[in-house]
């Protein structure tokens, strides 16, 4: 079911030196980065190793000239009530053939030292061909598996509008019962985004939906903000 909703979100992102510090140094064939902001994204930039609502950002990233990289990140320190310490470690390999073709492979391990049974892994791969980015990720979480396909088609000229898409299949280890009877064991969700910069503001028109509807939405736990179809217009501007 498509919910006829238009959400307008205006976000002003204020950045300071305190929350955007990056220390970088070359160590022979290695490039070391220590940062309080994410210094890397995976699968050709289509996978983000962070989570919403993080209370602390800090970590290191070490890259070798051969294309191998390794790093560790603490997206949350468990300071706020109801949150737990999380330490993410990743290992990957990125190789460009030329300026138009490159690929990337890797794995992220999500660790919760105080909640060890919740540890999980995410495997990812990405390919860039003539400005188009394609990616895939598979998450092996406790009691569920998520498989995601990404596509970023780049910017269409002369309009300057980009197109990116995401499609995810969710398999639940334990079926979720719904009020009207029956249960949900698997579902899909997807989103398509049209970004465009305008006078220093990043505009994003996003449509998202899922395969669930009606009472089934009580079992939704996917990537979108809600189960039903939603159109969102988001405006962001960063001040430095």
Task: Annotate each predicted stretch with a short phrase.
Residues 1-29, 239-240:
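Cleavable N-terminal export/targeting peptides
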Residues 20-77:
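Short glycine/proline- and aromatic-enriched beta-strand/turn motifs that initiate or cap beta-hairpins
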Residues 25-26, 119-182:
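Detector for outer-membrane/organellar transmembrane beta-barrel domains
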Residues 35-41, 73-77, 94, 108-112, ...:
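Outer-membrane beta-barrel pore domains and translocons
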Residues 46-53, 77-86, 110-120, 138-149, ...:
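Solvent-exposed loop/turn segments connecting transmembrane beta-strands
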Residues 60-64, 93-95, 127-129, 136, ...:
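Residue-level signature of outer-membrane beta-barrel architecture
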Residues 66-72, 99-105, 131-136, 158-165, ...:
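Repeated loop/turn-to-beta-strand initiation elements of outer-membrane beta-barrel proteins
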Residues 130-131, 192-200, 225-240:
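Outer-membrane beta-barrel "beta-signal"
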